[in-house]
Design a protein with these regions (language model features):
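Alpha-helical segment proximal to the catalytic Tyr-Lys
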Residues: 126, 172-173, 244
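Short C-terminal tail/terminal secondary-structure segment
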Residues: 2-5, 224, 236, 247-261
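Active-site helix of classical SDR
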Residues: 121, 159, 167
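Short, small/polar-rich loop/turn modules that mediate ligand/substrate recognition or access, typified
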Residues: 175, 180, 246-248
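Canonical Rossmann dinucleotide-binding motif of NAD(H)/NADP(H)-dependent dehydrogenases/reductases
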Residues: 5-36
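Substrate-binding pocket helix/loop in short-chain dehydrogenase/reductase
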Residues: 97-98, 102-110, 216-217
Length: 261
């Protein structure tokens, strides 16, 4: 069996209806894993499940709500059997002026980007402990490591920095019962939400969206922004036996941005 083969593995993908979660779930499935998708909205889940395979189960879940996460674990075990992989790809980015922001919106980002990860890691962590095995992979960002000159990113950067430290802390805590905890820190990825931001920024700069995307890629060593598919190899590695002795790490498939940041 290949080091990267996921045959016999069962993965729950949080944020499975989003651009990145969907791509990574598809990558898991293509490498042999059975997957179950969870997200806060049903329509994107339906579309993602149909894209991956007709038999892919899904469950609408608000990962900030404890009872819903607990129910998701039970549902996932009923559908797939023993869960071996948890991918935390939930969360969102919204611009906040650090001198003028709404606390309710800020708390919503904290809940989506970090509280939900604590919640899923708690309940799936218990399941992993019972089985003495598990892989937790969380979606961080280069913005958890390096700031950006653009205004409005303080809240997002703070939540992604928290993801990195949660990853390290859980790795230390969960390691004794055979669970690895790692994260992926991508650069800009053109998800539907990011495309909306590109359109806004392009208009502000009086350029086309394609021109704006090229401008963003110009400062990256590989001279382009990434895609969700660029993250699949890293995710499969972290979900597979190839990474069994790696824990507490954030890996950066970012085109080299953190090398110069």
């Amino acid at each position: 069996m290949s080091l990267f083969d996921l045959t016999g593995k069962n993965a729950v993908v949080m944020g499975g209806g989003g651009g990145i979660g969907r791509a990574l779930a598809k990558g898991f499935a293509e490498n042999g894993a059975k997957v179950l998708l969870a997200d806060i909205a049903e329509e994107p889940l339906k579309a993602a499940a149909a894209d991956i395979g007709a038999d892919v189960p899904y469950k609408v879940t608000n990962a900030t709500q404890e009872a819903e996460v607990e129910a998701l674990v039970k549902f996932a075990v009923e559908k797939l059997g023993k869960i071996t992989i948890l991918l935390n790809a939930q969360g969102f980015n919204k611009k906040f002026d650090a001198l003028d922001f709404d606390m309710d919106s800020f708390r919503a980002m904290l809940d989506a980007n970090i509280t939900s990860l604590m919640m899923t890691s708690k309940y799936f962590g218990r399941h992993f402990k019972e089985n003495n095995y598990g892989k937790i992979i969380s979606l961080s960002s280069v913005r958890g490591r390096i700031a950006t000159k653009a205004n409005g990113n303080a809240a997002y950067c703070a939540t992604k920095g928290a993801v990195d430290m949660l990853t390290k802390s859980l790795a230390a805590e969960y390691g004794p019962f055979g669970v690895t905890v790692n994260a992926i820190g991508p650069n800009i990825v053109p998800t539907p939400a990011m495309v909306a931001i590109f359109e806004m920024r392009a208009k502000e700069n009086n350029v086309t969206v394609d021109e704006y995307i090229k401008m963003q890629g110009a400062g990256i060593p590989l001279r382009r922004i990434g895609t969700a598919e660029d993250l699949v190899g890293t995710a499969v590695f972290l979900a597979s036996a190839a990474s069994d002795y790696m824990t507490g790490c954030t890996l950066y498939p970012d085109g080299g941005l953190t090398a110069i940041g």
